[in-house]
Amino acid sequence: MTYKKFLPILEIIIIVVLAVFPIMLTMPYRAYVYLSWEGAYRLSEGQLPFRDFGLPVGGMYWVVPAIFFKIFGVQVITLLKAQAFLNILSGLAFRSILKTVGVNPVVAVTSVLLYCISYSFQNFWPWYNHSVFV
């Protein structure tokens, strides 16, 4: 297998592994994680933001965790699963931007690794600023 075929596969492996890795560990809670929990829980129960309950930010931040609550159940680990999904999407979007710009494949793999370690991997709990950026 040539490196031109191997490097895109390596990029995807890096993105998925670094996004899913925090699910397998006991991670420390982030401050104010209850905001993610409560908003997603209320949405998953059918309540509407700004009508049934107040939110400090826009309502779309809680949609993905609420969908994951419906699929996987209302548990704290579900917030990590939702964030892993968002991290995979953000990594693939970053990879797509690099491909569109025409970055050298070796530089692209290095950039994806740096992005995943410095940005995506550190945001393993749902956080408003990260989700809005994605």
Regions found by a protein language model. Give the residues of each.
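Start-transfer (signal-anchor) and selected internal transmembrane alpha helices
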Residues: 1-21
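Extracytoplasmic catalytic/substrate-binding loops of multi-pass membrane glycan-assembly enzymes
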Residues: 24-39, 50-67, 74
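Membrane-helix interface segments
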Residues: 75-76, 101-109
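Transmembrane-helix motifs of polytopic, lipid-linked glycan transferases
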Residues: 81-105
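Short helix- or helix-capping micro-motifs
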Residues: 108-118, 134
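Short acidic/glycine- and proline-prone juxtamembrane loop motifs at membrane-interface regions
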Residues: 122-132
